Amino acid sequence: MWILGHRGASAAAPENTLAAFSLAMTQQATGIELDVYQVEDEIVIIHDRWLNRTTNGKGMVTSHPLSYLRSLDAGNGEVIPYLAEVFEILPADAVLNVEIKHLSNVD
């Protein structure tokens, strides 16, 4: 059986942030569930289509450049992470459940 931190340990840290993912793993989660959007050539981790609920930004995730998205506060000073950054902090045996919200140019 797997125990997944939904959007990380989102009850204790800002959801879908590196802090939430790291905390979930310290709380004996087997892995994490996260949500992804493609923006430019990167995969970013955020749940909502709109930035307003989880960041100090406004508008749709996919209507902004990466530089703007990375400048936002996703809670407690956390930034919107890239998927590659999540791979860097998770243990090699962690389970990863990825919910694809938006991808463009998929071959």
How should each PLM-predicted stretch be described?
Residues M1-D107:
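Phosphate-group recognition and catalysis centered on beta-loop-alpha active-site segments
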